[in-house]
Amino acid sequence: MYHHVNTAGSFITVGLRNFEKQMAFLKAYGYRTLNTADFSEILNNPNANAAKTVMITFDDGWADNWHYAYPILKKYDIKAVFFVVTSWIHNDGIRYFDTAFPSHKECKAIVSSGRAKEVVMSWDELREMEASGLIDVQSHTHTHKKLDGGSVYEDLSQSKGLIEERLGKKCEALCWPWGIYNDKHIDLALKSGYRLLFTTELGTNTSKSSPLKIKRIAIGDIGVMTFRKKLFIHSDDGLSKLYLRIFK
């Protein structure tokens, strides 16, 4: 689970050097990277070979994902899933940056001030990445606000509809903002047409995992040896549960 890849060195940000080393490791050691369709196939087939499979996910849709992460993903032929907040996405085409990206805290402040297009990807950028066959754009809701009251269904449906309309694809996966959800939210997501629901709960997924409570692992700005250790621990469900029971 990633958010930012840039040079800011801030909260939930991975530096370019470490991110490239992480992706290079996956490529060199023969890991298979998944999009949501690949992942769904594994969940639906108890006999599927899930050895050395990983899903790279990015939350929010920050512009540094396009500017820094995507070229590295292309270089190593790595698939990734981008969960985007559709009300933040704009129509200003493809941009070329010549300045450093702000920190996560600054990005959130810029979005709150109504200037999301300065720090978030555009529909054209998302469309180009989708066309590569490497990037799978899915929903992180429409507003990234606390989901309560009678607006939840509208929020989830609007996000799904925009992604399908703008990118000409099916949107059947949803990632909950801040990992906050309840049983009613799950029911509304299913009613909206989602089939895969991603959480921030730490852990490993297997063919027996629920598609409505998909776990993830936060990576962070770590070197390749620590990255390798995380992959080893969480490649086995039993070992992952034991580790998280001790260190969570």
Residues covered by each model-derived region:
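C-terminal active-site subregion of NodB/CE4 polysaccharide deacetylases
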Residues: 1-57, 63-68, 132, 148-248
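Short, well-ordered alpha-helices that flank and scaffold nucleotide-derived cofactor binding pockets
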Residues: 71
